[in-house]
């Protein structure tokens, strides 16, 4: 889910932190990608014309493998080096959100069954997408595919977004890529969104620069995290009735969640907002400030040449993909990863010193002219 309303709030109050560009603008970059979010996207988006997920002859879902294979090739063809990060065990505090998702999924399954005989294809697809979840088996299949492709992946001990941010902070990669806005709470220098969307959607890539967000909002890290918790995150419920506008106003007025809670608790007659009983906002704050991650210095990322015959065995013989397409994709991978991705030009040039203003130039010219006249007079 991420943080409710954060994307729009940043666009409104910190527009200088936002950039939009095309995939080609990221050439030469290494990027840590939230794999679990990607697989979820692929299971929803990669479908047959009738709306069903891709399957092989045995009826096994293969949408996630198709998406991972072809979107990764697209990144490599644009001289981008991806590293995928998989979720580990979720924090205990996230249990409530996961339970809500399970209930929503079960309700969607019931709705889908109710309209099975009389509903339209569009209705069926809509409810079908709501039932999607990434299984452990699908995660393992994606990891096996990445190994054969020669693309590195990291198993995060906990949240994938936090590990992506750690790799970016530690200089292993340029940016963290995820659709979850709570990624920005873990301090990646840059957050990229829409990176693995299909070309057909024609969505530009969003880049959010963390330091510029804090600077524009005039907040330190802790205050920004408090804002995100107040907006609504996966770790705890928020204060009922508090939307983005009110949350921003309260944080600006009081400076922290502790003071907001104190004010609302001590002044029930001045506000309609009620703090949830035993609200674990402080525990949520600690999870954002000190997430469970592997230190970037301990992670060794290595991109290798793809195992073409291994890909044929796995993707064609076991999963039912077209051999011609897999071989063609493997050749593109081979070409893209051969010898490493080309470095960016901005790494070879230093900034040009700011030119002197015209007044300085004029003074120099006047001085030079005066010296010239004096020399002629002496002759």
Curated annotation (Swiss-Prot):
One of its GO terms (biological process) is DNA replication, removal of RNA primer. SMART domains: HhH2 (SM00279), XPGI (SM00484), XPGN (SM00485). Mg(2+) 1 binds at residues 34, 87, 159, 161. Its EC number is 3.1.-.-. It is found in: Nucleus, Nucleolus; Nucleus, Nucleoplasm; Mitochondrion. It comes from the Eukaryota. The keyword Phosphoprotein applies. Residues 344-379 are annotated as: Disordered. Phosphorylated. Phosphorylation upon DNA damage induces relocalization to the nuclear plasma. Its main location: nucleus. Mg(2+) 2 binds at residues 180, 182, 234. GO terms for molecular function: 5'-3' exonuclease activity; 5'-flap endonuclease activity; DNA binding; magnesium ion binding. GO terms for cellular component: mitochondrion; nucleolus; nucleoplasm. DNA binds at residues 47, 71, 159, 232, 234. Residues 361-379 have a biased composition (Basic residues). Keywords: DNA damage, DNA repair, DNA replication, Endonuclease, Exonuclease, Hydrolase, Magnesium, Metal-binding, Mitochondrion, Nuclease, Nucleus, Phosphoprotein. Structure-specific nuclease with 5'-flap endonuclease and 5'-3' exonuclease activities involved in DNA replication and repair. During DNA replication, cleaves the 5'-overhanging flap structure that is generated by displacement synthesis when DNA polymerase encounters the 5'-end of a downstream Okazaki fragment. It enters the flap from the 5'-end and then tracks to cleave the flap base, leaving a nick for ligation. Also involved in the long patch base excision repair (LP-BER) pathway, by cleaving within the apurinic/apyrimidinic (AP) site-terminated flap. Interacts with PCNA. Three molecules of FEN1 bind to one PCNA trimer with each molecule binding to one PCNA monomer. PCNA stimulates the nuclease activity without altering cleavage specificity. This is Flap endonuclease 1. The gene is FEN1.
